Amino acid sequence: MNSNTDLHHSDDQDFSEFLNEYYLQSNSQSIEPEASYEDGEMEAEWLVSAGYPELTKPFEQGLEVSKKDLEPILTTLSKPHAEAIVQLVRTLNKTVRVRTKSRPKRKPDIRDVFREFDEQGTVTRSRSATPDSLDSLQIDEAWTNNSLPTFVNVYEKNTETAIQCVEQSNEIYLKQNLRRTPSAPPKSGTYADIFRGSQVRCDIPLYSADGVELLGYSRIGTIQFPRNRSVSDPFCSIGRSKESRSENDARSQKKKSSEVLSASENECGRLLPMPYNVLSFESICRDSSSLDSCEVLDTCDIPSTLFTDVVLISETDMKRLQTILWLELATIFDRNKVSLDKRKPFKRRRKEEGNLFGVSINALIRRDQQVTGTDSSLVPLFLEKLIGELLRRGSREEGLLRIGGHKQKTELLYNELESTFYQNPDNLDNLFRTATVHELSSLLKRWLRELPQPLLTNELIQLFYQCHTLPSIDQMNALSILCHLLPPENRNTLRSLLSFFNIIINLKDINKMNVHNVATIMAPSMFPPRYIHPSDNNSIAEQVRMAAQCCRLTNILILRGEKLFQVPNNLIVESQKTMMGKKGWHRHRNSNEITAKPSGKASNVGVGHDSTVINKYSTNLKHLHPFVI
């Protein structure tokens, strides 16, 4: 019982810590408006990101992509990546076909509807489309006739008789032969208001016709439509029907009451002895499947020659590599049947009014370069110094990141940094020395919380979250690919934070902060609720599941650490092969086989020469940014 009580207490404490950070995130900024993609737009965006915008042009014109245009591109790709391209193109073509079928058809012409009737007629008709052209009588003969049509005469004489005919429901009405008249001006009388518009240009119907029978009529304003009455109205049939239905339902419920009660008792008896079979925040967070896979991969001796650090790849090669990374990510998601839910960027930019807090990472780095006059490490200067101070004084502090600082002192420090950081950056060290480590950790979480865009970017954060549906190995590969796709400043900032978290975790015996504690505290900052939120905000189960998955993903990101930023060399070689394929890869390869090349030079890069690729990036360090913790 004591172990169960401790587990309950730990579960409640962890979830309450997450909720505290979650509410701080929710109260700071409202939920971002989501701009949804139209059908096919997301697939077109993926093709553009993968470097194949030419495949989206037929879709923009409402046409399907032909095999003739697709085959030359597929020959330059590996089989999994080619299948990913084919799947995206197939979706675009399907969208085009659906749009073509859903287009509104032309309204049918009235002359087409009565074409057979017109062909069978023997009387020459007028070419006009007026009702007079449909009359079977000649115009002169109709107007020279002194007597009114049969219907008019009968109606004037037998108005009361016709009203009685309406009340007699079982009476059989006489049928007469079909007879149509031109639009004669009706006589003034009591019948003028029977048919609305009869004084304009409307044919007067007869009592009977071939296939048409006049059953009755009502004066305008005499027809009463039923009104919706309240259930308490004694004249309301709706209420009586509802009561009868409720009585029937009550009888059926009485018959099933014993079965329901017995089933509920069995269910409660099954769940009460095992309270942890229900949805639990702690059980999802501590799901050991992915965490065990991380530990297995960490213990395996994977040769470092198979990977290249992302900071060693030049900017030009990184742009070329991103096309393959998008295809590799699409392959992983398609293989596991997970939707490529790439978030559509919000066009209207948020106004950045702050000086240090509430400012994008890119803007902070530009300001740092203006102040220091040197190349930046693509990590904000404020964050570098803040992490350095926390590591120097607080790495062994118990409850670091969990315990909050003094609220009033933290607010004073926040205002001082916001107003004087870039005006007097040398004073930063003095401000940090006067603050406690818990106040500094509160500033770190607040800085992440007030970023105008999430650290994982608005475009990729939904893909990061969807990785929780992938199996363990694919999940870690997808997370690594997404880290490579981040902008350089976001990627380096994330790397700096993960390194800081791992240093804290390595001292968990002293500071009492293990990986689960750190992930629970930092998950709302990594996955802000204004971007990642359940579809049903009123469902407690959905909220708990979402919170637990965010903590679990943050846990995996921390455990993987530096391994997230290692690029497989086979992807680097494939990116070169793809680029060469667009420019004549086969011709270039044949010329390299004929021409003798000196050995040991980094410029001679071919397919399958992984060591040569590593030498190339190892010798070119001009683009290398210093990485500071």
Swiss-Prot record:
Arginine finger (site feature) positions: R402
Pfam family for this entry, one: RhoGAP
Assigned GO CC terms: anchoring junction; apical cortex; cytoplasm; plasma membrane
Main location: cytoplasm
Effect of inactivating the gene: RNAi-mediated knockdown does not affect epithelial integrity or apoptosis.
Region Required for interaction with Moe: start-end pairs: 185-294
SUPFAM superfamilies, A to Z: GTPase activation domain, GAP
Keyword list, A-Z: Cell junction, Cell membrane, Cytoplasm, GTPase activation, Membrane
Annotated Basic and acidic residues bias: 240-258
Annotated region described as Disordered, given as residue ranges: 237-261
Subunit structure: Interacts with Moe (via FERM domain).
Described function: GTPase-activating protein (GAP) for Rho1; functions with the ERM protein Moe to regulate Rho1 and control proliferation in the developing epithelium. Recruited by Moe to the cell cortex where it negatively regulates Rho1 activity. Can also promote cell proliferation independently of its GAP activity, perhaps by acting with Arf6 to positively regulate Rac1.
Protein name, per record: Rho GTPase-activating protein conundrum
Taxonomic classification: Eukaryota, Metazoa, Ecdysozoa, Arthropoda, Hexapoda
Annotated gene: conu
